[in-house]
Amino acid sequence: MNAPHTPHLNEAEAAAAVEANAAELGRRALTRREQKEAYENNKLFKRLVRQVGQAIGDYNMIEHGDKVMVCLSGGKDSYALLDILLRLRERAPIDFDIVAVNLDQKQPGFPEHVLPEYLTKIGVPFHIENQDTYSIVKRLVPEGKTTCSLCSRLRRGILYRVAGELGATKIALGHHRDDIVQTLLLNMFYGGKLKGMPPKLQSDDGKNIVIRPLAYAKETDLEKYAELREFPIIPCNLCGSQPNLKRAEMKALIRDWDKRFPGRVDNMFNALANVVPSHLMDARLFPFAGLRATGEADPNGDIAFDEDPCGTDASAPGGAKSVSIVQFDDL
């Protein structure tokens, strides 16, 4: 709405008129900087929603009638996961239910009121599972050693059980792109295997389907989103355990690469969805022993003496041909 033309007003009076007009509209006029921030924040929101929606569609993570159990730790990632899934559900062409679950492991200083108050406020069904795994871990793990591995195994088993009790058909975890690449590097550097963190898999007990809807999202975007949404973050080091130093090293490495070599981490992530078994060395994935020359050209055959061209624009996971069962209106 344009203000009426008043040629006799000086600059101060004109500014006052603009402020008064904004007040009449019930809000203060935004500065140019505020307008830019609002624009960037809106882009961030749309990007995250688009990435989560695409991941869900590419891997058929959520289907009609599903009951999705969102594992909520109180960290930025799980808050963002719940928030975005709730927004997507409003526009989804399918019906599915969401229940938030938190495992209270009785860590010293854990603010047990935070999550129930937050979830009640936003109107999301939730379940708090109280299990003193902290005492078990402290009893079994020597002082000074990281407790993360044992704690994770105990937590996983409990959450699988809770999913069955609640009738959940999918278990949603808050792992993102950076977590997936970190896991790939950890397995390569310390485990001697090409293994990442899949966006969808069957649990080791064979009874649950685990999904990671944030698989395409960058951690830096999730950090910014958590700040904008002002989630009541709960610290992740209440147990006093030493952090996983190897994973912290991979995280620092990825952050450094993202700054110094734009696109490198994206290409590493995309490589997980563009695997060529015939050009690796795993005989379980490709029948090297029985390979014979057929006399027919093979586009996937070895180019032998030529240098393999390195692409810098590897297509994203899912590719252009993927068909999403969940499509959302423009936001």
From Swiss-Prot:
Catalytic activity: cytidine(32) in tRNA + S-sulfanyl-L-cysteinyl-[cysteine desulfurase] + AH2 + ATP = 2-thiocytidine(32) in tRNA + L-cysteinyl-[cysteine desulfurase] + A + AMP + diphosphate + H(+)
Protein name: tRNA-cytidine(32) 2-sulfurtransferase
Remaining remarks: The thiolation reaction likely consists of two steps: a first activation step by ATP to form an adenylated intermediate of the target base of tRNA, and a second nucleophilic substitution step of the sulfur (S) atom supplied by the hydrosulfide attached to the Fe-S cluster.
Summary of the function given for this chain in its UniProt record: Catalyzes the ATP-dependent 2-thiolation of cytidine in position 32 of tRNA, to form 2-thiocytidine (s(2)C32). The sulfur atoms are provided by the cysteine/cysteine desulfurase (IscS) system.
Species, as recorded: Burkholderia mallei (strain ATCC 23344)
Chain positions of motif PP-loop motif: 73-78
NCBIfam families documented for this protein: PRK10696.1 (NF007972)
UniProt-listed Enzyme Commission number(s): 2.8.1.-
GO biological process: tRNA thio-modification
Keywords carried by this UniProt record: 4Fe-4S, ATP-binding, Cytoplasm, Iron, Iron-sulfur, Magnesium, Metal-binding, Nucleotide-binding, RNA-binding, Transferase, tRNA processing, tRNA-binding
